[in-house]
């Protein structure tokens, strides 16, 4: 049964949090009064550009950023890193590329002279201007404090980068990892290949149960170690078969399975 309301008041919000920006707040609560607040800031196209949360242990904020190409596709995901701020808010120009005052799209969505699209990659971030690049570098002012001694040096590449096929399908062509040894064009990026399935391959896999080859797709992925894996998909995008392919990567200290047999197929 509802009882009488003892007290009630009217509250008016005079001004909201950074009212000139697009943002969304999410707060999670746990036992013993624990809570976690995360704010996402969006640009004019409502794409998430910066995510800010708070480290309740150090009472400082942690910032992560996403960068997009001219077609609005997510290209660069910068690792989260702590700041010296104690208030959750947008930090403009938190990450900057070398020789640039801001992260213009031309820094990573532009073909430089002497290169082609397949060999293009984003430059390093400038550790001298702060941000994530400074945190993952010898220029980190707190590098000698406690566990900070174990923070790796990203050498200006504390981000992952995605390259897309130039066919307007939005399919990924390659994806680099964090650090200089796994970035795009390092030889350790993940590459993706797309093709149609061959009828002879389907017959070998499924025998008389195989359908017509035009109804199937064959995709291949080369991981950071150089190992290829193949997936066969039906017209609904469902995976119907997977397999490893190619020779063992030179870096892999493994033996072939006893069942491995080489076979050759000649096509016209």
Task: Please place each PLM-identified region on the residue numbering.
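Beta-strand elements of repeat-based all-beta scaffolds
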Residues: 1-268
């Amino acid at each position: 049964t509802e009882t009488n309301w003892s007290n009630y008041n009217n509250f008016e919000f005079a001004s909201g949090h950074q009212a000139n920006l697009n943002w969304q707040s999410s707060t999670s609560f746990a036992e013993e009064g624990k809570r976690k607040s995360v704010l996402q800031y969006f640009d004019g196209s409502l794409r998430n550009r910066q995510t800010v949360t708070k480290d309740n242990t150090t009472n400082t904020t942690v910032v992560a950023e996403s960068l997009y190409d001219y077609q609005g596709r997510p290209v660069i995901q910068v690792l989260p890193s702590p700041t010296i701020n104690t208030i959750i808010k947008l930090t403009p120009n938190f990450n900057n590329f070398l020789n640039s005052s801001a992260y213009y799209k031309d820094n990573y969505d532009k073909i430089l002279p002497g290169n082609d699209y397949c060999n293009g990659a984003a430059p390093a971030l400038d550790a001298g201007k702060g941000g994530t690049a400074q945190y993952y570098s010898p220029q980190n002012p707190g590098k000698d404090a406690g566990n900070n001694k174990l923070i790796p040096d990203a050498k200006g590449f504390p981000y992952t980068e995605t390259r897309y096929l130039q066919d307007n399908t939005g399919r990924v062509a390659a994806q680099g990892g964090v650090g200089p040894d796994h970035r795009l064009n390092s030889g350790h990026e993940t590459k993706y290949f797309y093709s149609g399935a061959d009828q002879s391959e389907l017959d070998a896999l499924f025998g008389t149960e195989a359908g017509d080859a035009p109804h199937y797709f064959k995709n291949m992925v080369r991981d950071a170690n150089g190992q290829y894996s193949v997936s066969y998909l039906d017209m609904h995008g469902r995976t119907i078969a997977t397999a490893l392919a190619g020779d063992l990567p030179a870096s892999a200290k493994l033996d072939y399975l006893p069942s491995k047999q080489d076979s050759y197929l000649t096509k016209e």
